[in-house]
Amino acid sequence: MAVSKEDVLEFISGLSVLELSELVKEFEEKFGVSAQPVAVAGGAVAAVEAVEEKTEFDVIIVDSGDKKINVIKEIRAITGLGLKEAKDAAEQTPSTIKEGISKADAEAFKAQLEAAGAKVEVK
């Protein structure tokens, strides 16, 4: 009596992960093949690239922290706002400091504000 594909699949489905790993290694040795993933075809790469990466980011202060004066100074340096506007932005959190900027700029502004003591999000 010959063993069918269904019998083989049923047997394999009953194996543990360790047993499956050993079985794969034995297949590789016996048949001289590798179980490495096959390279993705060109059409699939195009589909992955079709997913747009976000290009515009907003810098939002979630909390000014204990060092509000330093945070206000950084807000003024980043935005060019006057003292009152920068103070309002620091005190009325969450507040958006910059909108529609590049990821590099957003990360740089985030680092500046966090160094001054603020908790910042980039969205």
Swiss-Prot record:
Forms part of the ribosomal stalk which helps the ribosome interact with GTP-bound translation factors. Is thus essential for accurate translation. Pfam families: Ribosomal_L12, Ribosomal_L12_N. HAMAP family: Ribosomal_bL12. Belongs to the bacterial ribosomal protein bL12 family. GO terms for cellular component: cytosolic large ribosomal subunit. The lineage of its organism: Bacteria, Pseudomonadati, Campylobacterota, Epsilonproteobacteria, Campylobacterales. GO terms for biological process: translation. One of its GO terms (molecular function) is structural constituent of ribosome. It comes from Aliarcobacter butzleri (strain RM4018). This is Large ribosomal subunit protein bL12. Homodimer. Part of the ribosomal stalk of the 50S ribosomal subunit. Forms a multimeric L10(L12)X complex, where L10 forms an elongated spine to which 2 to 4 L12 dimers bind in a sequential fashion. Binds GTP-bound translation factors. Keywords: Ribonucleoprotein, Ribosomal protein.
